[in-house]
From Swiss-Prot:
<dbReference type="InterPro" id="IPR038619">
    <property type="entry name" value="MraZ_sf"/>
</dbReference>
<dbReference type="InterPro" id="IPR007159">
    <property type="entry name" value="SpoVT-AbrB_dom"/>
</dbReference>
<dbReference type="GO" id="GO:0000976">
    <property type="term" value="F:transcription cis-regulatory region binding"/>
</dbReference>
<dbReference type="InterPro" id="IPR037914">
    <property type="entry name" value="SpoVT-AbrB_sf"/>
</dbReference>
<dbReference type="InterPro" id="IPR035644">
    <property type="entry name" value="MraZ_C"/>
</dbReference>
<dbReference type="GO" id="GO:0009295">
    <property type="term" value="C:nucleoid"/>
</dbReference>
<feature type="domain" description="SpoVT-AbrB 1">
    <location>
        <begin position="5"/>
        <end position="47"/>
    </location>
</feature>
<keyword id="KW-0677">Repeat</keyword>
<keyword id="KW-0805">Transcription regulation</keyword>
<protein>
    <recommendedName>
        <fullName>Transcriptional regulator MraZ</fullName>
    </recommendedName>
</protein>
<dbReference type="GO" id="GO:2000143">
    <property type="term" value="P:negative regulation of DNA-templated transcription initiation"/>
</dbReference>
<keyword id="KW-0238">DNA-binding</keyword>
<dbReference type="InterPro" id="IPR020603">
    <property type="entry name" value="MraZ_dom"/>
</dbReference>
<dbReference type="Pfam" id="PF02381">
    <property type="entry name" value="MraZ"/>
</dbReference>
<dbReference type="GO" id="GO:0005737">
    <property type="term" value="C:cytoplasm"/>
</dbReference>
<dbReference type="GO" id="GO:0003700">
    <property type="term" value="F:DNA-binding transcription factor activity"/>
</dbReference>
<dbReference type="InterPro" id="IPR035642">
    <property type="entry name" value="MraZ_N"/>
</dbReference>
Length: 143
């Protein structure tokens, strides 16, 4: 399980340090792709395979399903961690997430997210301000 918030910098070549606690879970390779809310999603190979099985069941006759799968897969990239504990994030993904210098890597249960510091701060401020309302709405999900 991924959890916690870690602040790192991304260098000019697009290399970002993966938190040590995450590296232990990720294995030899894992997948990073576009995420929602302007961040990137990272999955272990096992979690990616589970997600892939679900995505393959989406009906091709639904325009939104086709668009989502196309957008999600087209940016997916297999990553490997180098000897310094870094991954290289392709330019297209850096652009999607507005990754410049300061980044935040966040654990979110079965995946991790990579955010620009500015976007993360804006999201966290809004979520904190509305946390009670958000929590109240979670009752619909039996939490």
């Amino acid at each position: 399980m991924f959890m916690g918030e870690y602040r790192h910098t991304i260098d000019a070549k697009g290399r970002l340090i993966v938190p040590a606690k995450f590296r232990e879970q990720l294995g030899d390779s894992f997948v990073v792709t576009r995420g929602m809310d302007g961040c990137l999603f990272g999955y272990t190979q096992e979690e990616w395979n589970i997600l892939e099985t679900k995505l393959q069941k989406l009906p091709l006759t639904k325009k939104d399903a086709r668009a989502f799968v196309r957008f999600f897969y087209s940016a997916a990239t297999e990553c490997e961690i180098d000897k310094q504990g870094r991954i290289n994030i392709p330019k297209s993904l850096r652009t999607h997430a507005a990754l410049q210098k300061k980044c935040v890597v966040v654990g979110v249960s079965n995946r991790f997210e990579i955010w620009s510091e500015d976007r993360w701060e804006a999201f966290a401020d809004e979520a904190e301000e509305n946390f009670d309302d958000i929590a109240e709405n979670m009752i619909d999900f039996d939490l």
